[in-house]
Structures are given as structure tokens and as C-alpha cells.
From Swiss-Prot:
Site entry: Transition state stabilizer: K334
Active site residues of this protein: K175, H294
Name of the protein described by the UniProt record: Ribulose bisphosphate carboxylase large chain
Record's keyword annotation contains Repeat: no
GO process annotations (BP): photorespiration; reductive pentose-phosphate cycle
Gene: rbcL
EC number: 4.1.1.39
Note: The basic functional RuBisCO is composed of a large chain homodimer in a 'head-to-tail' conformation. In form I RuBisCO this homodimer is arranged in a barrel-like tetramer with the small subunits forming a tetrameric 'cap' on each end of the 'barrel'.
Taxonomic lineage of the native organism: Eukaryota, Viridiplantae, Streptophyta, Embryophyta, Tracheophyta
Domain of life, per lineage: Eukaryota
Length: 449
């Protein structure tokens, strides 16, 4: 063995702290179709080279530790280690870089979003060598996505269940979100559904509080939607929030919803957790329930531009874990969301095959194969005058959800629902006739009123 080879071979076995880039930075690596690929926005500490920072992320999210251990010799490090295979600077940010990391598929348990995130983001984000770290995107290989059930039903099956085609669906979050009795809550549900909405919704923090226990709410809401169905001849739904303190309690609520014969339940998938969400999604498919997903707590994870995780990653994870709807921003409402970036992850939710497009924040081509699609929900600070823009931006396969935009109508809940339904149908008809919603939107709404 030459002295040079001997030195390189022994580096990994010296006592003390080692440089990660010696083992985990591999710019010559050619990614495999079966690799999970990750794009991290890395902000190294001053004096830390980007190659070392990227390699540290690859190491700490796969097989690495801070020093050499003798048990490395009992397995194949080359087979199981993550590899930082490319680094590029971020335009306009001198201290930030995009580090691309490839993970062998054998590192991950089949059908487990929980295990995937525990590995990829579970430990590396607290690493000293990094000032900040953000997971921008993941490429999920088809060999891994096929181990997931995904959404309980998907877009086409939902439309068939509801017998509603050719337009976005309309929803409303019942307000005030907290404080109503179950009977008054059910009354508001009835008025909104009777007025023309397809769905009403529990807010994310409506679970089973002293002022309104979950069983009472479920009963009054079921009564309301059956009454509205009888009067309108349309299938109606209310998102009954099954989120609870334990998985057992969550499943008990979902079972009761099924016994009532309602079409849809709801879950807060980030606060409830991916294990609970996947369990509920499996139950919903087996028992014919649609599953609405709220993303409560997402901004804690995704709002900072240089640290955390972009929502497109959470959206991909939800499609794998399971949900038929998920809140996805509005572009035009009160909550943050850039149009191109929002439409990028909307396509990741709905479409089967999405090409890489950095202008929309999509770092990798994603092929979902046969995994059902998820309806994006536009909700948050929107009202009837936003209808033309929402119809143009989201197209037909979306849920447009107006809370205050329905219940804030000066004539009451039912007239507010009527106004939204009339505006939606006017916008869809105008679009189908070739009119320009962006330019003529307000005029179209005035004509309909």
C-alpha cells in the first residue's frame, strides 16, 4: 500500500473529531432511480466550507457520527451512507448554498412517513456547524411511493361520491370557531349547506372542549347536513374533526362518524402526527370516508426562509401519508403565499407527474405513478370578490373555503352561502365562454348579483 493510500485509508479511523467531507461529500456520485433525493438550503457557520456543511447534513441524517467507531467495520458504509453529491450557491445570498443529498432506499421503513422524516430531518437541524438549515424539496422514488396507500380516495373518487363535476367545490369554516353550543353550531352548518355550499368545516382547534363535546357536535352536524340534503337534493358534507389526544380516541370518533353515515372526517395532521394520520387514512379508505386535512402548525415549520422545511415537502408527505383535501394557501387572501410557488406544490398534490421547475420551487421531477391526487383547499381571508381570481388560479380541482366570507354576510349565513355559490357558478360559466376572469372578474360578479 502506498503512503498516500495508507494515509487516506487511516483518516476515518483516527481518534477525535473527523471531517465529514472525507466520507460523505462525493461530487462524482451518480444518483440512482431508487435514491431519495433531498435539496437542503444550508447556511454554514463562519469558517465552515459549504462542502463540509453539506457532508455533515448527509452524515447526520444517515449513518454518520462525530468520530470513527469500530462498528463501522461490521457493515457496508458505502451501501448505507447518505451522500452530498452537489452544492450550488443561492443567488443573492452570499452565505447560503443548496446541498443535494442522496439517500439509499434501504435506510427507510416501507410505508412510514414518520421514519422518513426521523431520518432526514430528525437530527441534522441542531448541528453546530450550521447556522441554519432548510429542507426545500424531496424526490420520492416510485419504488418507495408504491409502499404507501396515499389518499383514502383521491380526486376522481370524491367527485363520483359527491356527484359534482366541472367546478371547484365550496366550503365554509364555522365561526366563531370556539364558544358555540353544539346545537347552535349545527344550526350554522345547516344554514350554510342549505344556501348552496358543498361542505362546512370544524376549525382546527375544535376537538372536544367543555362548551361543545365532540359527540354532541357530530350528532347536530349530521342532522344539519341530512336536512340540507333533503331540501337541496345535493350531497353535503361537514368536516368532523376527529383529532384527539390519543390515536384510540381519534379512531373512536372516526368510527362514530361512519356510523352516522356522514361522508367526510377531518384531521390536523401535523399536530396529530404522521403515524396517527396514516392510521386514520387507512381506516377512511376501508370504510368509505373522505379525509380532510388541516395543516395547523405548518408556519412554525415552513415560514422562515432559511430554516425549517418548505411546505412543498409537507405536501408531498401528506400525499404519501393520506388525505383527500389539504389547506394549501390562497395567493389572494390574508395568509402568506407566492403564486408560482403555491401553484408548484398544488401541482405536486394533484398531478401524477411533475417536471422539475426551479421557477416554481420544484427541485426534482416527481413521478407519483398511481398514487391518488389531493384536492388543494384555498382558505383564509377570502371573500366573494376573490372568486374570479381563485377560479382562474386553482381551476376546477380545488375546494374554495370562505369562513368570514360566508358568515359575515349582512343578511346572514344562508344568504352568504348563496352569494358564494352564485358567484362561483357565474365565474365558471364566464370562463367556459372564454371571458377573461382577470380583467372582467368584478363585472362578472356584478352581473350575477
Amino acid at each position: 500500500m502506498s503512503p498516500q493510500t495508507e494515509t487516506k485509508a487511516s483518516v476515518g479511523f483516527k481518534a477525535g473529531v473527523k471531517d465529514y467531507k472525507l466520507t460523505y461529500y462525493t461530487p462524482d456520485y451518480e444518483t440512482k432511480d431508487t435514491d431519495i433525493l433531498a435539496a437542503f438550503r444550508v447556511t454554514p457557520q463562519p469558517g465552515v466550507p459549504p462542502e463540509e456543511a453539506g457532508a455533515a447534513v448527509a452524515a447526520e441524517s444517515s449513518t454518520g457520527t462525530w468520530t470513527a467507531v469500530w462498528t463501522d467495520g461490521l457493515t457496508s458504509l458505502d451501501r448505507y451512507k447518505g451522500r452530498c453529491y452537489h452544492i450550488e450557491p443561492v443567488a443573492g445570498e452570499e452565505t447560503q448554498f443548496i446541498a443535494y443529498v442522496a439517500y439509499p432506499l434501504d435506510l427507510f421503513e416501507e410505508g412510514s412517513v414518520t421514519n422518513m422524516f426521523t431520518s432526514i430531518v430528525g437530527n441534522a437541524f441542531g448541528f453546530k456547524a450550521l447556522r441554519a438549515l432548510r429542507l426545500e424539496d424531496l424526490r420520492i422514488p416510485t419504488t418507495y411511493s408504491k409502499t404507501f396507500q396515499g389518499p383514502p380516495h383521491g380526486i376522481q373518487v370524491e367527485r363520483d361520491k359527491l356527484n359534482k363535476y366541472g367546478r371547484p367545490l365550496l366550503g365554509c369554516t364555522i365561526k366563531p370557531k370556539l364558544g358555540l353550543s353544539a346545537k347552535n353550531y349545527g344550526r350554522a352548518v345547516y344554514e350554510c349547506l342549505r344556501g348552496g355550499l358543498d361542505f362546512t368545516k370544524d376549525d382546527e382547534n375544535v376537538n372536544s372542549q367543555p362548551f361543545m363535546r365532540w359527540r354532541d357536535r357530530f350528532l347536530f352536524c349530521a342532522e344539519a347536513l341530512y336536512k340540507a340534503q333533503a331540501e337541496t337534493g345535493e350531497i353535503k358534507g361537514h368536516y368532523l374533526n376527529a383529532t384527539a389526544g390519543t390515536c384510540e380516541e381519534m379512531m373512536k370518533r372516526a368510527v362514530f362518524a361512519r356510523e352516522l353515515g356522514v361522508p367526510i372526517v377531518m384531521h390536523d395532521y401535523l399536530t396529530g402526527g404522521f403515524t396517527a394520520n396514516t392510521s386514520l387514512a387507512h381506516y377512511c379508505r376501508d370504510n368509505g370516508l373522505l379525509l380532510h386535512i388541516h395543516r395547523a402548525m405548518h408556519a412554525v415549520i415552513d415560514r422562515q426562509k432559511n430554516h425549517g422545511m418548505h411546505f412543498r415537502v409537507l405536501a408531498k408527505a401528506l400525499r404519501m401519508s393520506g388525505g383527500d383535501h389539504i389547506h394549501a394557501g390562497t395567493v389572494v387572501g390574508k395568509l402568506e403565499g407566492e403564486r408560482d410557488i403555491t401553484l408548484g406544490f398544488v401541482d405536486l398534490l394533484r398531478d401524477d407527474f411533475i417536471e422539475k421547475d426551479r421557477s416554481r420551487g420544484i427541485y426534482f421531477t416527481q413521478d407519483w405513478v398511481s398514487l391518488p391526487g389531493v384536492l388543494p383547499v384555498a382558505s383564509g381571508g377570502i371573500h366573494v370578490w376573490h372568486m374570479p381570481a381563485l377560479t382562474e388560479i386553482f381551476g376546477d380541482d380545488a375546494v374554495l373555503q370562505f369562513g368570514g366570507g360566508t358568515l359575515g354576510h349582512p343578511w346572514g349565513n344562508a344568504p352568504g352561502a348563496v352569494a358564494n355559490r352564485v358567484a362561483l357558478e357565474a365565474c365558471v360559466q364566464a370562463r367556459n365562454e372564454g371571458r377573461d376572469l382577470a380583467r372582467e372578474g368584478n363585472e362578472i360578479i356584478r352581473e350575477a348579483s
